[in-house]
Amino acid sequence: MSFFGFGPAAELDIALTDGESRRRVEHKTEDGKKEKYFLFYDGETVSGRVTVSLRNPGKRLEHQGLKIEFIGQIELYYDRGNHHEFVSLVKDLARPGELSQSQSFDFEFTHVEKPYESYTGQNVKLRYFLRATLSRRLNDVAKEMDIVVYTLSTYPELNSSIKMEVGIEDCLHIEFEYNKSKYHLKDVIVGKIYFLLVRIKIKHMEIDIIKRETTGTGPNVYHENDTIAKYEIMDGAPVRGESIPIRLFLAGYELTPTMRDINKKFSVRYYLNLVLIDEEERRYFKQQEIVLWRKGDIVRKSMSHQAAIASQRFEGTSHPETRPQHSGAAALEQEHE
């Protein structure tokens, strides 16, 4: 309600040119909820229309100009006063003057660079948005519209498997192997665990997917670890020579691509955490970083078929006893209270 003439004398609305046909995707908001936003990719044009609707048609509205901005910005939650803009484009839509009726203004930002993927995390948010502003002497009228940006990658040229022998001296030696070190977000992790020596009573084994978000620089660095998935490999005691297969489907989890040193503000990395628990509830673990990437939506074989092919290839490899042994074994770390 306008009081003594103060308050918004007009409303702004932003509509995209291809809003009827453009794909929408769910994206997590700062409060943890999911909402749908229009999806864009790097290099795509962003165009549309800003409509100024007068609250009192027929009554003239003075203004100091109308503009539209396209902004990409990073906000660190511990430094909320500062917004770090890495993309900032502006177009003037109307010169200072008067409006006597509601009016629409077209805009176009051609082939816009959108270098990073949209991200909402524990301590940081990277967002892209359009902001229309009608400048007035007392109170500006503004309207924002968020969009989501995905960054696509091509298949990595080098994607070697991960093989490592780990253990506790004279107590436990295992070899774990994952078929790749880089996985797309709908991929399947195929692997196996091979027990070379078992002299302690293991009662449970699992693989966790851990997301590690790092924000800030220098003394102001914050780390947040989030366990995205827990995959039980084994429930019960293993024996020497036993081989346990792993098939972990990534499509069911809330994952993002790996992000490294984004605008020198934050990173998001993913780790496979192999966890063993003995009968005395002692926990041993070994972490291995993997790289996650997003590929375009193309026609592909079903996930189950994809997993079957990968596991057939994988299970066709020889056992560790028939392969050259590794030069050394890494130690399993014990988790302390």
UniProtKB/Swiss-Prot annotation:
Keywords for the protein's UniProt record, in alphabetical order: Cytoplasm, Endosome, Membrane, Protein transport, Transport
Gene3D superfamilies: 2.60.40.640
Localization terms from the record: Cytoplasm; Membrane; Endosome
An annotated GO BP: intracellular protein transport
GO cellular component: cytosol; endosome; retromer complex
Pfam families reported in the protein's UniProt record: Vps26
InterPro entries in alphabetical order: Arrestin-like_C, Vps26-related
Membrane disposition: Peripheral membrane protein
Major localisation: cytoplasm
Keyword Cytoplasm: yes
Chain residue ranges for the region called Disordered: 313-337
Entry's family note: Belongs to the VPS26 family.
Physiological role: Acts as a component of the retromer cargo-selective complex (CSC). The CSC is believed to be the core functional component of retromer or respective retromer complex variants acting to prevent missorting of selected transmembrane cargo proteins into the lysosomal degradation pathway. Retromer mediates retrograde transport of cargo proteins from endosomes to the trans-Golgi network (TGN).
Subunit details: Component of the heterotrimeric retromer cargo-selective complex (CSC) which is believed to associate with variable sorting nexins to form functionally distinct retromer complex variants.
Protein name, as recorded: Vacuolar protein sorting-associated protein 26B-B
Native organism: Xenopus laevis (African clawed frog)
Gene encoding the protein: vps26b-b
